[in-house]
Regions:
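Non-heme di-metal
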Residues: 2-168
Length: 168
């Protein structure tokens, strides 16, 4: 199930990424699921680098978004320490999750891919906010809220690129 996005000639279905990826996220024990989400953030960073190559005239903005995704992952990894003996358990569902994520974008042109990603950033911000709302540690809550802000900042940057592109 997804949300329909209409803009000009574009008619893109925006998936609910939490629902789409829940079969993979649910395979990870709850106490390390933020670390799994951090790995997904690194996947998004890789996507942004790919878009920067496809759209070199916009690479500065897209690479800023990639850096933000990596920064989110770094902050989450620092805030949620994990015994390295759990690495295999953490990474086991990752290939399926990344394939599912990438498959959403496969049939779309780069601009529609960015439309989906801008919405995914806003969904990601909501996910960090939901985790923060139930976390007992104020310092971790601060980190989670900062991650949400980075997600929203990237969404705004991508929305500005899309507005510029659509205005042509």
């Amino acid at each position: 199930m997804g949300l329909r996005y209409c803009r000009g000639m574009s008619n893109v279905v925006i998936p609910r990424f939490g629902e789409l990826l829940s079969p993979y996220i649910s395979q990870v024990p709850p106490e390390i699921s933020p670390r799994f989400l951090a790995l997904l953030e690194r996947g998004a960073a890789s996507r942004y680098r790919g878009w920067a190559e496809m759209l070199p005239e916009h690479s500065e903005v897209l690479l800023r978004c990639a850096e933000a995704e990596d920064e989110i992952a770094n902050r989450i990894e620092a805030a949620f320490p994990m015994d390295e003996s759990r690495r295999a358990e953490l990474e086991a569902p990752l290939p399926g999750a990344l394939k599912t994520y990438y498959d959403v974008f496969a049939p779309l042109d780069p601009w529609d891919q960015l439309r989906v990603q801008a919405n995914a950033e806003r969904q990601g911000a909501g996910a960090w906010e939901r985790i923060a709302s139930t976390h007992p540690d104020p310092k971790v809550i601060e980190v989670l809220n900062s991650c949400s802000e980075l997600e929203l900042s990237s969404a705004d940057l991508v929305d500005a690129l899309l507005a510029e592109h659509d205005g042509r």
